[in-house]
């Protein structure tokens, strides 16, 4: 239906999601803004995902959902508390600049799912502690390697403007003041 398509493609991150919305997102599968994680298993992988989302359009990581099948497995209360703590640690200590995330727990199929909301960043480019800049490519993440992409991220953040950049091999004598 239109509602399902609209939600899958254009879900706004209003940070409050009900179980019906979450079920529809899970049915739509992973996208560039929605990622599934059964558990918090590797902090470097989660850090890379958070960096990629911050450098792109933002997104959500849904914990308690199998990433290959979309099966809802859920989390215990203790797992939710532990993952919340680990997410805060990653966002504060493993990313540069620091990002701020919001989390919420949503119940679907009588199972608790932790939803971590990651906003598009204002201070791009974001990177992990190794200095790697990640971005989204469809549902996957990839390293940013090209200088032009890095420049674009700076420009998107408003930290660099083309008309303020030096032009190599020029001087003030090259300026045409009659224009």
Predicted regions mapped to residue ranges:
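Conserved N-terminal catalytic/coupling substructures associated with nucleotide/phosphate chemistry
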Residues: 2-179
């Amino acid at each position: 239906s239109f509602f399902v398509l609209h939600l899958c493609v254009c879900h706004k991150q209003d940070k409050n999601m009900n179980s019906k919305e979450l079920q529809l997102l899970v049915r739509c599968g992973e996208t560039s803004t929605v990622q599934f994680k059964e558990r918090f298993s590797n902090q470097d992988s989660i850090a890379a995902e958070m960096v990629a989302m911050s450098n792109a359009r933002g997104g959500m990581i849904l914990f308690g959902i199998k990433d290959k099948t979309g099966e809802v497995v859920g989390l215990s209360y203790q797992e939710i508390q532990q993952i919340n703590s680990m997410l805060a640690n990653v966002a504060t200590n493993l990313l540069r600049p620091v990002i701020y995330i919001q989390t919420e727990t949503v119940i679907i199929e009588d199972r608790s799912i932790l939803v971590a909301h990651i906003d598009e960043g204002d201070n791009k480019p974001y990177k992990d502690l190794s200095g790697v800049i990640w971005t989204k490519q469809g549902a996957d993440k990839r390293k940013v390697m090209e200088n032009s992409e890095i420049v674009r991220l700076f420009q998107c953040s408003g930290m660099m403007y083309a008309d303020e950049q030096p032009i190599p091999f020029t001087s003030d004598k090259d300026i045409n003041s009659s224009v």
